[in-house]
């Protein structure tokens, strides 16, 4: 069985680190914004161990002062080509 992970963990870590925030400080800022979390929750997000719902994405973006789409990794043309070829392969008769 394939394990799925959230895609934004590494980007959240980079954005948090760029602001000079510890996981504890980031968790406190998220709590002030209304999100129920703690340092352990931030750690799990960054380690890609938990799925994130829309509300969580909005809290993260709000506190980090970025657009939600900036939380997701950038995809290059190679990724899109690979996706296209994978879809093409699965639709062959």
Label each region the model flagged.
Residues 12, 23, 39, 54-57:
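Helix-turn-helix DNA-binding elements, focusing on the entry/boundary residues of the two helices
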Residues 19-44:
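Short alpha-helical DNA-recognition segment
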């Amino acid at each position: 069985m394939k394990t799925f992970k959230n895609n934004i963990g590494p980007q959240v870590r980079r954005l948090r680190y760029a602001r000079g925030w510890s996981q504890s400080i980031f968790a406190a800022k998220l709590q002030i914004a209304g999100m129920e979390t703690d340092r352990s929750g931030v750690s799990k997000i960054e380690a890609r161990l938990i799925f994130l719902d829309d509300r969580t994405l909005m809290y993260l973006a709000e506190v980090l002062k970025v657009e939600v789409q900036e939380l997701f990794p950038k995809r290059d043309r190679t990724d899109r080509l690979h996706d296209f070829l994978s879809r093409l392969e699965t639709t062959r008769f």
